[in-house]
């Protein structure tokens, strides 16, 4: 099968991930109910009686239902007249009429789902109902809880442990709990455990699934559940008082399967269906994967009676492990007391005493035959110790029931026939599925198991995909190598295909299908392939185009086997990968791949583990911050909650980067600064500094170590310790730089090197002490020549001084002030019709500024490309001001050069406004100042707030202005006066310029124009006959008061509050914000030419000539990007990793010393101490009760002995007719289960397989034969075995059977059974052996698989007593092989001959065998034929296989003994 076909698709991942979060496709509830009802009616049936026959009670049928509940056909049947009532014939199936949601009411409004099902319902349909219709996730474990169906007492401590452990194992493993479903006995305890968990958790997420399988005919108030179309919901009331012999459903179960066999009042009708359902689930693959690991099933037993014993017995025969809780009562205590006793000591007398002790009043109902059967079944149970686990609270083990359950499953798994590496891998996969790290640490990763990294890869993949970070960490601690795990490209592709539902997954799906998917649209059926080029393109989009793709074509080249994703297309289309040739400098870092996979899904714990595996940890943390902030920005509209979580995780990794960098900076500042500017091949050849700037990690940039680097870059080759006044003085009189007045960094390096050289010289002198002075001088001279630094010459000092960004900045400040001074002079003094020399100089100056802006636009500082550079340029506010000022200047210049006086004046006005913008540009220059810079940031923030305030204010201004203008003035047509009256006057009113035209007392007709004829006067308001205004004076004054109340008081105070909030917000972080924005200015002046405007034109001319004609553009400076040699790179990263480990260790230590951690630790210790004292008290009480019971029994026996002595004395020396009582020995005391040690039988039990209760391939049950009654010499009067012959036989009469008696003893059945003849039935086993290797270290034998017994066995066949050996071998092996084995027969040796414990044996027929060993050489023709026979048998139901001769190779005792003798004969290990 094509590998790609097995790989999961993205749409499946989306569906599963959504299901994990409890989200399903949004369908209306009515549609879901209709769909459920339709499916149930089609697939689920109920049973009803179709033949009414009274059972002796009036109006009651044999089925238990009253006559009124029978249909007319059942009351008057025509087909069954005269027949006896038979449940199998007179009960029919019809569509069920009881299903839906069940509501129990009360506190919390508990609800569940229920359905009435026929007892013959297909288990496949039931499982489909639960998983597809009820939307239950497939279980990772099935816990079948069985025991007492009636209420019973259980100790408080044991009850708490059971409830806590059951919920814990179900919660952590994702298990289903299966019970009887009624509100009584053990089912009630399970329900109470679920209730306690629900109340404590307070949420429906991670709901425990508890499925009750109850008989429909015994449910009280079941009529409320019946409706042909289903009830949504059905209101069910718990009525324990009126239930009588019936039972109520438990209100704390989540789902109910109500099994209907057509009868009423009969318990146990659900047992068969429940067993079939458990068997079906146990055969399903764990996690719906084809890994060969099936869903494990465990049986938990509390209390219990005869029905529970049958359940345990049958479960263990089906290889289901059982956990018995000692102290829960009755059957559970009986089994617990004999669990540590040898089977040979478990007698009928012991079982009789235990039943009397634990069943008390119920013991009277036990018959002798029942005690015999109980003894036999308990003996068989004890013979399967790998499937039996007893949980005792009085043992010195402080763990709950959950650990006992999981340990029982692992113990059963270890005893599997396929033990070995496969067994360990299965156990590990189970532990991963259960998410139980504690079990894996204690039971799997032990000294017995040796794991390689490749062995743990499947578990690692499951843990990563299943979001189990603790398991991932455990696997890494136990040898998983991330490099080996991610070595194959397909592994990483599969990880991305298994991403849970997240924003990145939707973006990736959109990219795979070419961007045609709309927002919110889920991928639809159809398939395209995903390869790491898709991931690389998406990650590059998130990181920024300044980075290179993370996955190069040579490392991860997409192939035809790439993982498939579902996209909406009609067929399978191959999406070609990007054809871009990626840089070969990009390296493969598996830790980075794992970290990146966890980050994009916003998984904090897995990302933390991946980050710890990264080589370049600071760059990784900063890159994660950038990716997460970008994802949060893009997903904000879709999922604000997810965006918030992403921002929190981004802040976390910014803190991690700060922490590691602080650790590095405290140890070595120079190496730490080198980490900031080194090019990181793992992260797209970016730098830590640039990643932090792109991610807007202000706190990281504000770190003292980063600021020290920026200050160093700012000063250039000058020392950072130079005072500003020295720099300014040298700018005025530059020859001072040659006098030592100004310190250069080279001078400081020389001084430091001289100090180090002096120290090393002293060390070398001490090393070469005693040698000649000439030799010491030669060593010192050679050392000095290797490490000597030369001081800067005069020209280098001058160029270094001029190229310093700090000096450039000061020159540009002076130049800009000169420009503004010249601009102001021209505008105010020298703005003539013909341009003067000052104005011409201004134009030249502006030209230099324009050229510099063009250079900045095209200067690709980080190599990200012109498009990105242009976008960044436009986004900068200061660049916008620069462009605006230049455009306005050009516009003003064009108008100024016109001949028209009007246009000339307009040009001057434009230039004056432009001067304002140039002055505002000064704020950017002074942002470098530590004092003014933060204030400029505050002003910028307040300007943004002012825009929002003006929007609110404009509403009131326009509202009041239009209303006032309309009231006062009639039909004003002059636009300028309309705007003045409706906008301007209301606006200036806010600042205290109150209008006079709204008050009649201040009205002056001379101040206005009546007909609006005077353009310089406003129009008069409407006048009456005496030339006074007619508007209502009270209204305009009231409007003014209300307007001033809202505009002048409310809104202005709101503006003050907004400004105050902005000031406080920025002021708290003003230093951080200033340090972050300081970088932009440093970067600008670092790349700026040395000459200030207007002399900068010379620099621009040189750059133009070099770029256009010489094609020799200057390289980007190494102060911001530095490529390290490979050796230096490895050393630096190793040092960084060491610093990271120090930081993480200190962080963990700080957390452990925190107050919260100490309080939590103290609370845990107090709880453990309280539990220990409580358990100790219960242990003392239980021990005391046992001692008192034993003392009472011994006193009673002593009294009997004394009575016998008295009777003997009375007889005057004659023997007393009364036998002396037998005193109990220590061994009998131990029979009561007080033995603490686990004992085993010294010898094998007599034919154990021949006494199995169920005879193979039949419905016949043997008579139970306890071990003590096996021997024919022992009297067993109740023994009445059935007679069974699979084939008709005339030898079934008693006389013929008595002629043959099984030498092994009683078997519980008479006749031939499935054997051919009475008496011995002979079988011959030829054992072919060979050496696996040339060193003769491993001996192998030819084995055959017995499908019925599910085990490997020896090759063999039937033989007649007097039949020649060659003839038997010919029938077993064939004629060809038989001819080639004749020579081996001479050297063959008979290693065993005698009785065989076979499950087909009876009292009168049994199996005897003869085993012969035949050793083959590896290069003989016979060996070739045998190997061919093995290969050809693989497809048959009885395959052959060469297996190692070992103690676990065969299960049968006689075959195991034969293999032991063969191993001893060949001197090899067994």
UniProtKB/Swiss-Prot annotation:
Region (Disordered): 1215-1256, 1281-1314
Topology Cytoplasmic: residue spans: 1-725, 739-808, 858-876, 927-941, 1060-1087, 1106-1470
Gene responsible for this protein: trpm2
InterPro entries named among the record's database cross-references: Ion_trans_dom (IPR005821), NUDIX_hydrolase-like_dom_sf (IPR015797), TRPM (IPR050927), TRPM_SLOG (IPR041491)
Source organism: Danio rerio (Zebrafish)
Residues annotated as binding Ca(2+): 853, 856, 879, 1084
Entry keyword set: Calcium, Calcium channel, Calcium transport, Cell membrane, Disulfide bond, Glycoprotein, Ion channel, Ion transport, Membrane, Metal-binding, Transmembrane, Transmembrane helix, Transport
Ranges in a coiled coil: none
Pfam families, A to Z: Ion_trans, LSDAT_euk, TRPM2
Outcome reported for the amino acid change (mutating residue 274 to A): Decreased channel activity. Loss of channel activity
Organism taxonomic ancestry: Eukaryota, Metazoa, Chordata, Craniata, Vertebrata
One annotated Gene Ontology cellular component of this protein: plasma membrane
Motif Selectivity filter boundaries: 991-993
Chain intervals with Acidic residues compositional bias: 1231-1244
Stretches assigned to the Extracellular side: 830-836, 898-905, 969-977, 1003-1034
SS bonds (residue pairs): 1008-1020
Region (Divergent Nudix hydrolase-like domain): 1157-1470
Documented effect of changing residue 267 to A: Decreased channel activity
Keyword Nucleus: no
Protein name: Transient receptor potential cation channel subfamily M member 2
One BP annotation, GO: protein homotetramerization
Membrane topology: Multi-pass membrane protein
Keyword tRNA processing: no
GO molecular function: ADP-D-ribose binding; calcium channel activity; calcium ion binding; ligand-gated calcium channel activity; ligand-gated monoatomic cation channel activity; mono-ADP-D-ribose binding; monoatomic ion channel activity
Catalysed reaction equations from the record: Ca(2+)(in) = Ca(2+)(out); Na(+)(in) = Na(+)(out)
Intramembrane segments of this protein: 726-738, 978-1002, 1088-1105
Chief localisation class: membrane
Family to which this protein belongs: Belongs to the transient receptor (TC 1.A.4) family. LTrpC subfamily. TRPM2 sub-subfamily.
Activity regulation, free text: Activated by intracellular ADP-ribose. Ca(2+) and PI(4,5)P2 are required for channel opening by ADP-ribose.
